C-alpha cells in the first residue's frame, strides 16, 4: 500500500515523499526516525548505524526503520521525533516518555544531552524535538497547551546556539 501511495504521489508532484513517518519505511525520499529514549548514550547507539543496516531496530520505539526487503539507499535521514520528556508536575495530568523531569534544570540538562548526541551523527540531515507544546493528554511539550513556556526561553536558546 505505501509503495502504491509513494508512486502515486510522485506521479503528481516531484517534491520529496515520506510514506510512514518514524519507522517501517518502504520506498521513500527521506528516512525519518522516532526515538523517545531519555538517555543520550542510548539515543546515539540506536542511531549511529542507520546508514549501514537495512533493518536496524529502533529500540525506543521497538519497530524497525525499514520493512523487510527494504534498505537504506542514501536518502537524507531526519530524527523527526525525539525527547518527549514531561515535567514531574504534569505526570498526573497525562503522560510523556520516560521518567518526568524534576524541574526546569533537569529538563534542560536532558534536552541538551539528547541534542548533543544527535549532533554527533554527522549523517543526519535534521532533527525535531517532540514536542513544542502539550496536546491533550500528551504533557511532553516545552510549552503548555496555552503556549506558556515551561522552561526559560533564553536558556533553551543558549542550548540550541
Where in this protein do the model-derived segments appear?
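Catalytic cores of secreted or luminal carbohydrate-active enzymes
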Residues: 141-161
Amino acid at each position: 500500500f505505501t509503495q502504491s501511495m509513494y508512486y502515486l504521489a510522485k506521479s503528481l508532484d516531484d517534491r520529496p515523499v515520506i510514506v510512514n513517518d518514524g519507522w517501517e519505511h518502504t520506498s521513500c525520499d527521506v528516512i525519518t526516525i522516532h526515538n523517545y529514549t531519555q538517555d543520550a548514550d542510548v539515543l546515539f547507539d540506536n542511531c549511529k548505524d542507520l546508514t549501514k543496516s537495512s533493518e536496524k531496530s529502533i529500540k525506543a520505539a521497538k519497530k524497525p526503520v525499514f520493512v523487510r526487503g527494504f534498505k537504506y539507499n542514501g536518502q537524507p535521514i531526519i530524527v523527526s521525533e525525539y525527547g518527549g520528556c514531561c515535567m514531574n508536575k504534569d505526570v498526573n495530568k497525562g503522560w510523556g516518555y520516560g521518567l518526568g523531569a524534576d524541574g526546569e534544570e533537569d529538563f534542560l540538562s536532558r534536552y541538551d544531552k539528547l541534542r548533543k548526541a544527535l549532533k554527533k551523527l554527522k549523517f543526519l540531515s535534521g532533527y525535531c524535538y517532540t514536542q513544542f507544546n502539550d496536546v491533550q493528554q500528551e504533557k511532553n511539550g516545552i510549552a503548555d497547551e496555552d503556549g506558556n513556556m515551561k522552561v526559560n526561553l533564553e536558556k533553551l536558546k543558549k542550548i540550541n546556539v
